[in-house]
Amino acid sequence: AEWVDKIKRYTLEGDEVLGKALVFLCFEENRLIGLLSIRYELPQELSYKIGDIGYGVRPSERNKGYATKMLKHALEVCREKGMKKVILGCFKDNMASARTILKNGGVLIAEKDNYQKGRLSQYYVIEL
């Protein structure tokens, strides 16, 4: 429940359209393991702010390879959508997320203060 509440806190609200999105849920034995969102047709400045792909894995299921598999699937979907590259971001201290991005071909392109939390974020590009 705490994990779901955290997801709700980070959900954007309002009428502003930020492009189109696909949301994938990862279940195992009827239990939500993780979720992933592909945000496509975003204006470029938003790609570099919120990323084209976002994902999260239930804390008890982390470090089991779920995020790597989810991101791999998302990249296949992005190719099918005709995307040539995707931008992903994570907090600098989120080593697990950085490893997930790197395992899927990510290349670090920028490091800057996060627009929401005042924390340092790293941004990666994955060429498709």
What are these regions (language model features)?
Residues 54-57, 63-76, 80, 99-103:
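Conserved acetyl-CoA-binding loop-helix of GNAT-fold acetyltransferases
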Residues 57, 90, 126-128:
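Hydrophobic residues in beta-strands and at strand termini
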Residues 88-98:
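Conserved beta-strand-loop-alpha-helix junction that forms the acyl-donor binding cleft
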Residues 78-89:
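Conserved GNAT acetyl-CoA-binding A-motif
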Residues 1-52, 117, 121-128:
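GNAT-family acyltransferases
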Residues 89-90, 105-122:
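Conserved catalytic-core motifs of GNAT/GCN5-like acyltransferases
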